[in-house]
Amino acid sequence: FKNKRGGDEIVVQCDEGNTSTSVYDVLKQFSDNSDLKVVEFPLNNNFADFKNNLKDACSGNYIFQIDADEYPDDYLMATVEEVIKMNNSVDVFWVPRINKVDGLTQEHINKWGWNVDSSKRVNFPDYQCRILKNVKRIKWKNKVHEVLIGHKSESYLPANDEFCLIHLKDIERQEKQNKYYDTL
């Protein structure tokens, strides 16, 4: 909330029927004192539908979509509005992401075909399409490993740490997530 500007809207989407009451309790604390909007939609093992519902719930000209297990660098949040204004003809912006997995071994790296740099960043810059113009023709497709379609122009933010989303997890969570994706 510290980077929220006057016209900004924060929309949090919860997986209908699969979100704990403790999550709702935290969201209620924030929504009582801000412009936080909470929407529910069933994930139903379909990430594209889930993201499209979130997109439909947003009213701004652009959407900066961040997953629940990510957070943006402070510099990125401080400059994102300026980046969009300077490039307002761009439909989508690809944002670099720093992935770090605590407990990752060489065996995991080999098994999943990952690249890990000297800073222990996995597959850096791992660009994600996360800033998008809020127009009907742009939407997500594919149940898993979803892709954005309908955009006419795109731009990539610099692969500098200050422009990154940060995505941290431990190896147990990563293994569980990979197994889940394999079932879809």
Language model feature labels by segment:
Residues 68:
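Walker B catalytic motif
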Residues 3-5, 58, 85:
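Short, conserved loop/helix-junction motifs that constitute active-site signature segments
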Residues 2-40:
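Acidic donor-binding segment of Leloir-type glycosyltransferases
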Residues 47-55, 62, 71-184:
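Catalytic-site signature of metal-activated, phosphate-bearing donor transferases
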Residues 40-47:
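Short, acidic/glycine-rich phosphate-metal binding loop used to engage nucleotide
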Residues 26-30, 57, 83:
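Alpha-helical structural signal in soluble globular domains
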Residues 9, 60-62:
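Well-ordered beta-strand positions
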